[in-house]
Amino acid sequence: MEFLKIESILDTADNNRAFLSNPDIARLVLSKFDEMETKYRWRFPFIVIMPNHVHCLCCDSDNALVSLGKVLGEIKGSTAFQANRILGKEGKFWAAENFDHWCRSPLKVESVKRYIMNNPVKARLVSKPEDWPWRKPK
């Protein structure tokens, strides 16, 4: 239930911290996820970059090279540095914490996928998921 409260706050937050709505930063973050797939053999088949947070479905494989924490740490570290340069600012960019949820069945994976892809609609940013530009798959 705590997650739903946080999600509601994020979806209705003002735009003072909506740095991910900058197209250059959104592209940067999507590109970093792609890089991590190649580099560490984790898969991120569904990603949505919201104005102030990111949703992704991540799948490890039997040959993933590092932990998910390591992958997310690298994504957050390198994109924070580059995003701050784009914005001309310094300091903290991402929240320190991540929220994760293990999907233990194909049904749950499908539910999480739908949730992720529909998040821009739920936040009233677009009327259809496919209209949101900062997502994977397109």
Model-identified regions with their sequence ranges:
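Short catalytic/metal-binding and nucleic-acid-binding patches
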Residues: 1-138
